[in-house]
Swiss-Prot record:
Function: E3 ubiquitin-protein ligase that catalyzes polyubiquitin chains. Converts epidermis into cement gland and neural tissue in whole embryos.
Location of the protein in the cell: Endomembrane system; Cytoplasm, Perinuclear region
UniProt-recorded name of the protein: E3 ubiquitin-protein ligase RNF128
Entry keyword ATP-binding: no
Organism: Xenopus laevis (African clawed frog)
Catalytic activity: S-ubiquitinyl-[E2 ubiquitin-conjugating enzyme]-L-cysteine + [acceptor protein]-L-lysine = [E2 ubiquitin-conjugating enzyme]-L-cysteine + N(6)-ubiquitinyl-[acceptor protein]-L-lysine
Transmembrane spans: 191-211
PTM summary: Auto-ubiquitinated.
Amino acid sequence: MGALKMRCQCFPLPYLSLLALLLLNLSLTRAETLWTANVNYSYVYDNKTYGEEGEIGVFGQDSPIERAAGLVVLPKSEKLYTACKDNVNFSVPSGWTGPWIALIQRGGGCTFTEKINRAAERGARAVVVYNNGIDNEVFEMSHPGTKDTVAIMIGNLKGNEIVDLIKGGMQVTMVIEVGRKHGSWINHYSIFFVSVSFFIVTAATVGYFIFYSARRWRLTRAQNKKQKRLKAEAKKAIGKLQLRTIKQGDKVLGPDGDSCAVCIEPYKPSDVVRILTCNHFFHKNCIDPWLLEHRTCPMCKCDILKSLGIAEDEEEGTSVAIPSVSSELQRSTVQITEEENHSETASSGYASVRGGDEQVDEGQHIYENTELVHEASATSIEVLPHMDNPGFESEDVHVHEMKS
């Protein structure tokens, strides 16, 4: 369906309408165009040649528009001058071997096609039909199916004049030349207008397609470039976030313990979690791919790039010192209100790895209660190497210890 829809969009309705109108005009051009015929006939009388020439004929609609010449011949019987009978014959002089032209009268109850075909079957090179009436009025005949026989119409007066010459014993020869092309000036201008409109619409369609394709290519390229840059910045920002290992005894493992908001799996001892700038934490293997694509906390939508100042550095071109969460190893006080702002409950917050009722002494590490070790000697906080994440194998490993 998508491919079909795309094809339909490539040929809009105005484009198809103009094309149909152009084809219609071209088909009507032949019907509205009229070709005249220059007729030159001559005869010999008293050792002198007489003749007449003029644009007195009209080619038929289905006639070849070409030159024809020969001896003018009438049907043998005056009753058959219309050539509507199958037994019609023409009075071709004996011994005449050249081309001849049949002169036939209009009417008689048969069609122009029948008249022309009967004359052509008997050897006529061309057919001249003279009109009825009392003047030289002519029109364009319709005679489909006459193949390559040249057919023209002349007026009644001129036709009877030639008939009288032949009946008087004169041998009349005729040359039919192609005259001028006549047509409605409105038809010519309409064809010109439709043709110009067709090419304008075609050029506009092609131009718009090129512009749209180039613009879409530029936008796609810019978007891909931006995504690569943001992914690189996210990779840099992830490297500045802390990693912690959950150990037996942490509050997050208790009866009210929470689960990872990404994979919906409960936390277990030895799970490695990554702590975001908003103090929400998640499984490292769950949150790292998420941050590479979205760069925000799944819980509160906090943007890690803006929180760490990386995005502003890229846009403003200034160098800003970025304190990481892992660099704040000592805090004098911890405000309960700050913890409530970051996580209203122990669910999916850094407070869930701490005792809710414990007091934090001055100089005590902020993550002192993240790992509980049942030994009297020391409490150890382990920061895992980033080698667990293939994207950060080049970073260093830091181990911090605190005396209880």
